[in-house]
C-alpha cells in the first residue's frame, strides 16, 4: 500500500488469532544501532483500525535490555495515513547488537491489518537539522573545514541502472539535505546531473530529451520527485512552471522551498555532467550527450560553471566548449602517487580542473590494503603539495572514499586524499575493510580517524591564498614542500617521503615565532579501531640564525605556520 506518490510501499502487519500480549516489528539497523545516553526522535505513519497504546523502544537484540522507551497513544483509522512522532531518553549500550521496536496490543489489533510507512529513528543531528547528519560523524568532517561538496557523487549519479546503484544507500539524503549540509559547513555545492549513462545501458540522442527536461526541471521548473526527500514531495506534480532551486519565494516552488526552510534561492554555481564516462564505455556517445546537456543548461544559465566528467580527448567534443571545466579521477599506489607530484606543472594554464576523486592504493595486493598507513598518508601529502603548487589549474580536488561503516564495504582504496587549493569531499563511495578517511560501526566509540584524516586536517585548516616561490639549495625528493600565505600568516607544508631523517632550515621574512604541527610514524603504521596512536603534535618554535630548523622523521608530514598579523 503506497504512503504517497513518492513512497510506494509500506509494511503490512497482520496479527494471528492466537497472539497475545505485545506484538510488532523491529529494525536492526546496519549491523545494529548505536545507542548512546541521549535523546532520540522517532516517527512513523500508520493506517488501519487501532486505538490504544504503541510502545516504541530501543533494546538489546540478544540481551533484551531496554535502553529507552516511550508509550504513545494512537488513534489510527483505515481511511487515511496518520503521522505519529515522539522523543525518548536512552541509556548507553556498550554493544552494537541493538534494535528499534514498535509494539502494540495483539488483542486490539486482531482481525484487520495495520500498515506502517516512513519509519524513522534519529539521534541528535548536526546543527539540529531535521533529517540531518549524525553529530558524531559530521563533526570530524566539519573539523576539516571542507570547501565544497560534490553530490550525489560517483556511482550514485551514474547508477547500475537509471535511478539506482546496486548496494544499500541512505536514500533519505536528498537534494535539500545535501544543500543544508553545504550551508551548515560553509561548503560550495557541486551538483551532479545524470548524463544518460548507467552500467545498465546508455540513453542518447532524441531518447535523452526527457532527461534534459528533467535537468531543467531540477534547476528551474519542477524538482524531480526522486531528489526531494521532504514529505511535501508527495504533493508535487510534473510540469509546475515555477522554480525550486533558483526561484524567488514569490513563485509557487520558491514558496515551497521557503516552507522547507530556505527562503533564499540555493547558491548553485557548479554543475558536473555525469560520472566517469571514460572509464566505463561511454566515450562513443559522451561528446554528443555532453554538448546536448551543456547547451540545455548554458542557454538558460550562462553564468553557471559546467564540468565534463573526464579529461580524455577521445571522450570529449572535438571543438572545446567555452568555459568548460574537466574532472579527473585517479587512484595510485603510494610510489605512483608521489611520482605524480609534478603531473600538473606543465599542464595548459588556461585549463580548469576538478580532481573529483583520487587516493592512494596499494596495488601490490589485488584487494588493496585494509587500513590507511603512514607511508600512504605521506604520499598523499606529497601529492597535495603538488596540487597546491598548481592551484591556478586544479581549482578543486576531493578524495574518495570519505567514510564508511566497517560492516558495509564495497571496494578498496588504501586512503583518501584532498587538494589544498580547495578541499572537497566525496560522500558516495566506500572502501573495502578499511577506514578510508575515517570509519565507524554501530558499536559505541568506534569512530576511527585514520592517519590520512589527520594529514588532511593539517593541510585543510592551514590554507593560503597565495603560493610563493621558494629558493632552495636542494631539489624535491625525498623532501617536498610548498609555501603559501593568506592575510594573516605564512604556511609552509612539508612531507618526508623516505626512510631517513631530514633536517630543513626555513627562512620566513620578518617574524621569529611560529607553530609547528607534525605527524609521523613507522612506514606501515595505522590507526585501528580502539587503537588510535598516530596523531599530530603541535609545538611553538622560534627562528634561529638559520631560520626555523625542522627535523623531519621518516614518513613525516608537517605544517609550519608563522603569523605576521
Curated annotation (Swiss-Prot):
Keyword Transmembrane helix: no
Pfam families found in the cross-reference section: Alpha-L-AF_C
SUPFAM superfamilies tied to this protein: (Trans)glycosidases, Galactose-binding domain-like
Enzyme class, first EC level, given as a word: hydrolase
Catalytic activity: Hydrolysis of terminal non-reducing alpha-L-arabinofuranoside residues in alpha-L-arabinosides
Annotated metabolic or biological route of this protein: Glycan metabolism; L-arabinan degradation
GO biological process: arabinan catabolic process; arabinose metabolic process; L-arabinose metabolic process
InterPro entries listed in its UniProt record: Alpha-L-AF_C (IPR010720), Galactose-bd-like_sf (IPR008979), Glycoside_hydrolase_SF (IPR017853), Glycosyl_Hydrolase_51 (IPR051563)
GO molecular function, one term: alpha-L-arabinofuranosidase activity
Signal peptide: 1-19
Glycosylation (residues): 71, 91, 128, 303, 362, 486, 501
Keywords attached to this entry: Carbohydrate metabolism, Glycoprotein, Glycosidase, Hydrolase, Polysaccharide degradation, Secreted, Signal
Physiological role: Alpha-L-arabinofuranosidase involved in the degradation of arabinoxylan, a major component of plant hemicellulose. Acts only on small linear 1,5-alpha-linked L-arabinofuranosyl oligosaccharides.
UniProt similarity note: Belongs to the glycosyl hydrolase 51 family.
Protein name as it appears in the record: Probable alpha-L-arabinofuranosidase A
Protein encoded by which gene: abfA
